[in-house]
Amino acid sequence: DFMLLAMDQLVNHLDKLPLFGWTPKVIIRCRVGQKTPLDAGPQHTQNYARAFMTMLHTVRVDEVCTASEVTAYERALLWPDSTIIVENPIG
């Protein structure tokens, strides 16, 4: 949930920089907290991946729910623009 604190920089800076002719290559990895075996509480188990996908137009957002989706990291590395990878172990 600390990604919400970075929303100004993500939406108003990182997402807009390509419109001004500069395309930084940034890869951000964040994780959604699990509810089992220990509940991290409502503040750390919320998933904002869909909100990021809606608000960010030049930044790719990938949601990874299983270990088999490790290709998301390769895509982020090969993708020319910035990427946010949201690890959501509870799907």
Question: What residue spans do the PLM features occupy?
Answer:
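Conserved thiamine diphosphate
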Residues: 1-91
